[in-house]
């Protein structure tokens, strides 16, 4: 297959990875990694070694683990109960149907409602644990975004500069 077609497919996968950082239906950083892997395997334009793919893969795995662990851990660290954690998860799922703002505020609102309605916490404590959920979301989203930017940068560097 022609390198330009492979490069186009790789670029589309990487761009879909960026979309996946915001849209929960798409696996963001893993899609970008697949784009880089396709580029490495099938394009004659690729000059970086397998160690780059392996390191990127390790960061994708770390990011995937953080996506599930960090929001829950920070919700608990900020005083959240299991109701806040479950509310955050449900808020994330509900927020999926109202992109992109729903994905951003869904976990926060879910954690807040979980704490208020089921844990019977006052507004200040509920807001604190919901804030923990929101901070976890921001950190993991930022990590995935930076990872996708690095992978995109590698791709662009190899095609246009190298």
What is each PLM-predicted segment?
Residues 1-5, 41-90, 116-141:
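Membrane-interfacial helix-loop-helix
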Residues 6-13, 56, 147:
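Hydrophobic alpha-helical transmembrane segments of polytopic
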Residues 12-18, 36, 87-95, 132-133, ...:
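Hydrophobic, membrane-inserted alpha-helices
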Residues 14-31, 91-101:
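Transmembrane alpha-helix interface/packing and boundary motifs in multi-pass membrane proteins
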Residues 20, 93-104, 140-151:
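Hydrophobic alpha-helical transmembrane segments in multi-pass membrane proteins
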Residues 31-48, 90-98, 109-118:
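Interfacial segments of multi-pass membrane proteins
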Residues 34, 70-71, 109, 152:
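Hydrophobic/aromatic residues in alpha-helical transmembrane segments
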Residues 149-162:
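Juxtamembrane boundary at the C-terminal end of a transmembrane helix
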């Amino acid at each position: 297959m022609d390198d330009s077609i492979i490069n186009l497919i790789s670029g589309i996968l990487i761009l879909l990875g960026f979309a996946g950082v915001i849209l929960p239906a798409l696996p963001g950083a893993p899609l970008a990694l697949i784009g880089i892997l396709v580029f490495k395997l099938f394009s004659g334009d690729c000059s970086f070694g397998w160690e780059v793919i392996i390191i990127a893969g390790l960061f994708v795995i770390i990011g995937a683990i953080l996506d599930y662990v960090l929001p829950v851990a920070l919700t608990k660290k900020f005083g959240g109960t299991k109701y806040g954690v479950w509310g955050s998860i449900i808020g994330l799922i509900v927020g999926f149907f109202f992109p992109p703002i729903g994905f951003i505020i869904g976990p926060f609102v879910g954690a807040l409602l979980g704490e208020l309605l089921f844990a019977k916490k006052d507004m200040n404590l509920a807001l604190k644990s919901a804030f923990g959920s929101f901070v976890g979301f921001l950190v993991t989203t930022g990590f995935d975004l930076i990872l996708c930017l690095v992978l995109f940068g590698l791709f662009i560097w190899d095609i246009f500069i190298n």
